[in-house]
Amino acid sequence: MSTTIKPILLLADSQLLFWRDEEGLPFLQRARTLMEEDDPGKAFKAAYLGASNGDASEFYELFLAAMGEIGIRDCRHVKASPSSEDRQFLEQADLILLAGGDIDRGWQAFEASGIQQKLIERYYAGALLIGISAGAVQLGLKGWNEESRQLFDTLRLVPFVVDAHDEPSWARLSQIVPKAGEHTKGVGIPSGAGAVYHPDFSMEPVRHPLVEISQTEEGVRQALLFPGETHEVEGAAEQVARPRVVSPEEAISLAMGALTPEDDKVN
């Protein structure tokens, strides 16, 4: 499996899963092309994480249809409480999609299962990550509880706070960015749009303009980022998460735990 770090696809909703550009090419073909560059001819595996929507089967069916459009047939719905088979598939997945839904609900499930650390590891091992709505938020710096608006750290693989389909005012993101830490920026992705975040810390809007929100001395500032242009993300290197370094002792402990049958483990 390739270890080339790939772009992250951030989608406001599922529209881009089936959208075709002016030349008639599926947007998701970009994902297929990126994987083919490293492993031409491989039968790719695609994992769907539906914890944020309560593992609703109808959204997984949409995922299967989208993967079929780009010729990926080996797919699996990795549940909020993943089985050993789910974990094994995720370890081998070339493409991983974080579904939309409730940001906090999904994040709590990721933390409870340890999936959040595995996603960071898979990203740095070369898997291509896609986040839709809540999933896109979880790939960024901060998530929040919808009722209390309490902030919490998320995967931090994308060096800004993400929000989706809250246009035109982006009031929620405008309130969150000043609370998220000094120099933190936010990116709002409107309905039907997306963003491609590249490993060189640049970002590419897709289909519709994005809104970048930052805190200045004069207050909250909004700027439009247009498709067809590449935008540098300032301070990205200091913001993004890095793979966790495991000590030799911890590696042995994890390996021994993996070899222990589930029925023999102490609850």
Task: Indicate residue ranges for each PLM-predicted region.
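A short, well-structured beta->alpha microelement
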Residues: 73-87
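Structural motif
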Residues: 10, 95-99, 130-131, 161-162
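A short, aliphatic-rich alpha-helical micro-motif
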Residues: 90-91, 123
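Short helix-loop-beta junction
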Residues: 62-75
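Conserved acidic residues
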Residues: 44, 94, 159
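Structural alpha-helical scaffold elements that stabilize or flank donor/cofactor-binding regions
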Residues: 88-89, 154
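Class I SAM-dependent methyltransferase SAM-binding "motif I" and its flanking Rossmann-like core
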Residues: 105-111, 115-172
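C-terminal and late-domain segments of enzyme folds
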Residues: 2-41, 50, 54-61, 65, ...
